[in-house]
Amino acid sequence: MKISFHGQSCIKIITGDTTILVDPFISGNEKCDLKAEEQMPDFIVLSHGHDDHVGDTVEIAKNSGATVICNADLASFLAVEDGLENMAPMHIGGKRQFSFGQVKLTQAFHGSQTVRDGRIVNLGFPTGIVFTIEDKNIYFAGDTGLFSDMKLIGELNPLDVAFLPIGDNFTMGPEDAAIAARFLQAKLVVPMHYNTFPLIAQDPHKFVASLNEGIAGKVLEIGEGIEI
């Protein structure tokens, strides 16, 4: 399995002949190396409804026929407002089997709304995501602040990789993300959600260097991947 990083919180997981795209903020994202019109994933997974995470989901899903996995409120909105047909609605605490493995949604402390036709639309609770693929557990924290139940996430799902936001202002900053890494006890921690905008400018290498002894961290450059 290969996991690659594409700026902000966009990651791509390739397992066998299946491609999973997470939070595909591509258009308008100078830090992303992908082109929306070239993406043909089998699945799109969304952590929440903010525009910098839903991103190009509608265009990509319509072009590819991808199944979109997300919280049920966001799923309803995308189906009714944007005409998406292949939806897999879930909610926090639930898990579901797919052809590639299992998805479980966890809590995240953040918001989840958009503005459509001049009105503010709330799009359900933001989530984190635990993927179980090829007997590996990958935690994608989404946008969140630090919370103590991250310890429980790590206990219930021994983690091979954890993707954590470090941008501060809208999510955890580096200091809290380092605590989150200690709570989660993942084999590898990868920072995300930084340097896309001035308000979330951070040094990811400094974050990795700050991790407690025994916690491995890796900065993925745009387009770079890891094999697990």
Curated annotation (Swiss-Prot):
Gene Ontology molecular functions: hydrolase activity
TM ranges: none
Annotated keywords: Hydrolase
Source taxon at top rank: Bacteria
Coiled coil: none
Pfam annotation, one family: Lactamase_B_2
InterPro entries: Metallo-B-lactamas, RibonucZ/Hydroxyglut_hydro, UPF0173, UPF0173_UPF0282_UlaG_hydrolase
HAMAP family: UPF0173
The family this protein is said to belong to: Belongs to the UPF0173 family.
Protein name per its UniProtKB record: UPF0173 metal-dependent hydrolase lmo1577
Taxonomic source organism: Listeria monocytogenes serovar 1/2a (strain ATCC BAA-679 / EGD-e)
